[in-house]
Amino acid sequence: MQKTKMIFTIGPASXTEEMLVXFI
């Protein structure tokens, strides 16, 4: 989960990161 969060944080997904993390 942490790895995915880091990848999303680095990417252009800022707000979407929260939704994905949550989802994952």
UniProtKB/Swiss-Prot annotation:
Enzyme class of the recorded protein, top EC level: transferase
Keywords assigned by UniProt, alphabetized: ATP-binding, Glycolysis, Kinase, Magnesium, Nucleotide-binding, Pyruvate, Transferase
Pathway: Carbohydrate degradation; glycolysis; pyruvate from D-glyceraldehyde 3-phosphate: step 5/5
Keyword Kinase appears in the UniProt entry: yes
Coiled-coil regions, chain positions: none
Molecular function GO terms recorded: ATP binding; kinase activity; pyruvate kinase activity
Cofactor: Mg(2+); K(+)
Family classification: Belongs to the pyruvate kinase family.
Protein name, UniProt field: Pyruvate kinase
Species, as recorded: Clostridium pasteurianum
Lineage: Bacteria, Bacillati, Bacillota, Clostridia, Eubacteriales
